Amino acid sequence: MKINKIILFFFLSCLYLFSSSVSAQQLLGEIEITEKSFTIDASVINTKINYLIDNTITKPKLSVTSIFGEATSIDDILRISDDKKSLTFGDYTSSTLSSSNKLVSKINLNSLILISFSTIITFGLFTKNNPRSSSKPLLFIVLLICISIFNLSNSIKISEVSVRIDIKVPSTFKFDSLILTLGSGSSIINGLIASSLKIDGCTTNSKDHSIELNQISISSELNICSTKEININEIQLTSTNVKLNLTSSSNVNLDFHNGYSGSFSINTNDLTLDSACETFKDSNTGIIIGTCNGGSDNSKLSITAITGKTVVSNAEITCPIDNSWRVTVGADNVPPSPSIITSQPATDFIFKKNDLVYMAQYGYSNQSITDGPVENSFIVSYPAYIPPSNFLVSKIIGSPTFKANVKYQFSISVKLGQPLGSFNRIQNMSLYFFNPRDITDPINGASQYYELKDTIPLFVHTFEGNFTSNTEFALTKIEFTPTVDIGTSIFGLRIFRTGFTGGDVVTVIIKDMKFTILPKTITQPTLLIKDSELVNLPKPSTSFDPQDSSTCPYLANDLVHWHNPSTWPNGIIPSPSSNITLPEGKKVLISPCSISQTQVYKWIKVPSTSELIFADSPMDFHVKDIYVEGKFIMGTTKCRYNSKINIIFHGEKTLSDTISQYYGSKGIGVSSSGFISVHAKQYHNTWSKLSASAWSGDYVVYIQDNVNWEVGQKVVVITSYYQDEDNNQNEVMTIAAIQGKTIQFTEPLKFFHYGGQEYQAEIALLTRRITFQSSDVNQFGGHVMVMGEGQFAGLGLIGMGQRNIKARYPLHYHLGKVLKNSYISDCSVTNSYYRCYTIHGTNNVTLTRNVAFDVSGHCYYLEDGVEMDNTISFNLAAYVHPIGRPAAGPSQIGEVFVESDNLRQPADCAASGYYITNAWNKIIGNTASGGWAGYAFPNLDKPIGNHRTVQMIPKAYSTKVFEGNTGHSSGHFFITGATIYVGANLTYNEVDGLLYYDSGRFERFTYKNGTVVYGNEVPMRFNNTKIYLSNFGIGHWGEYVEVVSYESHDNIRSASIFGEAWLSKAIVNGNSNNIARSINFNKQGFQYYDTYVKTVLSNISFRNYIRNPKSLNDEDDNRAIISMTHGDVFKPQGISTARAISFVNVAKSQIVGHQVLPTSGSRYFNFIDWDSSITGKKPGQPALVGSHELWYKFDNTCEYNSDWTCHICEKGNKEIANIQFIIPGLIDDGVLVYDSFENLNVGNISLFGSGITERRSTIVTKNQGVTGVSNMGWYLYLKAGSPKYMKIWLSQVVYGQHIFLALPYPTQTTFIIKSNYIWGSAINYNHVFSLASSAADVRSGNGTKYYFDGNFLYVKLVNLVLTGDPSEYYERDGVKVYWVRNSFSVSIEATNTVTPPTSDGFFKNLPDNLPSSSL
């Protein structure tokens, strides 16, 4: 048994070694081709020949790869002649191996190994103890078989060998002669340049060899014979004396690159020849002869395909090479527009399975709605024993929309899944339209639970129908008329059965469930005559750019044609697969016929002395890379092209620099010495706004501006919805007709788009005559990167940009420093994988009148923080998407994102329409829709990227000009997000080399010219700004800001501005007439901040803040002005003022919202109504508004407003004051204590004197700071007792004001009281207080005296440093807000030897009695 196993192992080893000796796909070797005349004889072998252009090599080479057969080395099957000019295939295994051709074949080696191995085993077996083993004869047989096999395999059968021959040459190499003698197989020859090419596949054997030639260039002779089909595509004849002889037993397809001029003789069964050739048939031979393009016999074409078909194409010379010839210039052919329709057809809005969610009290699952049996149908399944009511809820919010008092139609076809019975009988159905906040979210909700309780829908309509058949669908069609406009709503169809289901599942099949907007006559509505009530939104000039056709670049008389062989140094027009460098010093003109419009050009370089100029004629140009050191011209400022020219960029995703070093791949790179100019027809305006609202089902819209848009072009109608990213209501439409400012679409609108007086949806043109676009490969589009001057106008960029690869953006000025005449005007970017228009390390560039739609990452992008003095004007950015998970985070904190492969610029988690790292640029007349923010001003402490070593502070620069900009539908990802967001922090980490982006609150100090010097501070200024449908309209975390002339509509909050902040000349409108607005959110006009700011509101009209009885509290309700009451550690000082405030459709109860909480933020809330325009207290005179605490009831003018939960008083000679008690161990300086109210409470402070007898007090906590009314007595009582030492910062006791402070102490206490000013001064403010004669003497004194009456210590707190200088307050519009500064303090040190303080430093057990009311 053991010997049999050995024999089996031995035999299998033999077979394995034999099979390995004939394995395929093995590189046999390479040969360098050194001669320009070369012959290959492969007549005895099957070959697959590939001729390839390879610019990675400098000399031609030939490689041979085994496909099938026994060859293991090229020495086995070919020989090269001594003169290196020919190569012959054959069986050379029996030849004697020379010293220069040392080869031991794999087969011979295998044979040697196997025979040696066999001998050893055989010897061992024969010498074993059992000489009679019957296995020995079998072993001999196996051994003989193996030896025979390997002897047989040692001899190659060349006829059974198949190889691939790859001939690779650099693109500039030209053969004088290439001769191929072929056996069976195939040949594909691409890009060959030769004087003579001969391919013989006929004479040596009868085996078939197919031949395909693509884009070859021949200057003398082409001779091909094949028994199979011959295909020649785009052959280029580079002289006027070329002989072509083609012979085939099958078909011949001959395609010329630029025509053929010469004679021909064709013998074929079937001939197709284009009209450029004159033919006649020889009556004797039947051969067709003639000439093409009037040519002579200098060039001759002979084709023999007697049994086959011959096609000769593109024989016409469409591209003459005469330098004076020009292609016909493209005309400005504007498609005629039909008349605008006067009646609108019906429009159906069908609900399919994936549009709906099943909701009920219970009994729901993800199988409640499944696919139906026919188109537009679905099955509703009811499990056992469930209640009789359920909803089918639409996932499509806001489509369709319905006008009040207009008739609409709803239809549904129903078939029961089982015969009608008591468990599946449908009693009725109802159309419900819900406010989104009143129903489970059908899109993002995690539950299907819904129970109709006390919810009041926007509209409901109940109907009965034919719901009884289980054999066929029964149609129910009803009409309904809404009583209210229905915009942002969630539609639910309630199906109400007569009872619970039984023990079995029942089903209902529904088909063609739809709303129908009925046909109507189109009547032009009343159109807007201005776009804003208050702000002035500038518009670009109505003039078109002046044109002068005589200056067009293609008319120059010193141009040479791309398609002229003499243009090129080697006399050969380069093939697309080659690396092409334009000849030095030449201006090369490309016409449509100059190039292949289907082949992909690999790489084109324009040297510094050369120019590549395109004709103004329609063409498609497929290319991978273009590198421009000279000039790339496709139109100029004064010669815009009318033709449709399309450049399509190709290439797989790579990080390699295939254009040139640092320029990446798949696009155009323009060096610092280069210049690019692309100018297509000017469409103006590139975007406009609606002049009337457009409804679901509308075909016709009305716009505000004259435009020259065209039938067939695409436009986008921008959303009128808040949460743009969650519910895309931007609609791309095609123009069917256009007349003046009226546009008709080919399809109806699905959504409502608002065009009211408050604001209007934008409409933007997407189509352009010249386009750059990409073959879509893994979000790896083309890009244009310009380091020199670049001018672009009227260019469309589609599917461009390379996701998460820096510097690979659709259109990009890169490290250009200060440019002189560069701009991007009236261009469009759509469906971008990475940004829109980028300015990087470049100044003095203009981006104007451009459009961008559907973009990932920041759109208009200033990259490193050094970009200044650029103009960004009259542009549109819409539907901008954060990359990855959008930044969120609690409150003001935000989140930190770190640079990674999936988020190369971490700030893209908060992608914006306009990303402005340095504010010293002109931002004028733009609009932004969507995105995390519309306009983002991140904080950069220093530049990033290529400019990390530049010494500047980008965030220190203020706005150069920010004028007339609008934004909407953004800010909703972050609780304090805003459409204009001045916040977040972007830093470069020197340790790990990565960017870090923190999306939250960061302070920002801005200075004149960015020079950080005290006294040089200037505000960021935002003029004539309109923000709507936003979270916070403007969010500014900086220190200096002015917002002047501002409209806020439908924002959750109009603005959140900090530091020295002025909001003036504004309309703050809580609710517009836009039915698509966010009705599911409460809104507040403005929230006063809670500490260390100076806020002035002036000349503001608050409108349409309507009470919501379901609000959580007064701050959550729809109020015009609200407090900030969330915490104890931050104490409001006298920091908030207002003047000239008015209200429209705001009930008095909704003017102020103050939430009563046990926090210092709530207790100390206050503001000054400078002219009583808010309170109506004493018109023209200032009023003081204080919180709910009696502490603010400082005189008899004070009244408590229960709606506001605030006191309203005449201000008189009072001001808001703030002092900060520092008591070691109780109230520590600079320590923030977060704890419960009970643990924070350390005592109280009360008003006294001025006739006050009752307690008017508030709580004092462990967090420093007490705010109240100045020129009043303040009595401090601490539960721990009065301290032996305390310091009092006079943080805000303004000039001319004081606080008369009283504290209880035990009798016989003595005091040392001092004042201290922490800064140096020529005047001594450090005093030791003297003992006065009475409390009255202290109060009437200068603030350097004290008095102790045996019960109370009296000190008058006066900030002795103040003089009333304007530097002590912030003033705008005649309104002052005083500084809060901890620089002047008063310290009190108490000593009592009779009743000493306890060890913790307090005098205990003191009575709590108010000082005299007569003081």
From Swiss-Prot:
- Name the SMART domains on file: G8 (SM01225)
State the membrane topology: Multi-pass membrane protein
Question: Which intervals hold domain G8?
Answer: 566-692
State whether keyword Metal-binding applies.
Answer: no
**Known Pfam families for this protein?**
CEMIP_beta-hel, G8
Q: Record keywords: Transmembrane included?
A: yes
Instruction: Classify the main location.
Output: membrane
An example of a Gene Ontology cellular component annotation for this protein is:
membrane
Cell compartments where the protein resides: Membrane
Which InterPro entries does the UniProt record give?
Answer: CEMIP_beta-hel_dom, G8_domain, G8_domain-comF-like
Segments crossing the lipid bilayer? 107-127, 138-158
Question: Which positions does UniProt annotate with glycan attachment?
Answer: N245, N366, N428, N466, N579, N844, N985, N1009, N1023, N1099, N1244, N1342
PROSITE patterns xref list: G8
PbH1 repeat start and end residues: 819-841, 842-864
Signal peptide range in chain numbering: 1-24
Keywords (alphabetical) are:
Glycoprotein, Membrane, Repeat, Signal, Transmembrane, Transmembrane helix
Q: Which family does it belong to?
A: Belongs to the comF family.
Q: What is this protein called?
A: G8 domain-containing protein DDB_G0278975
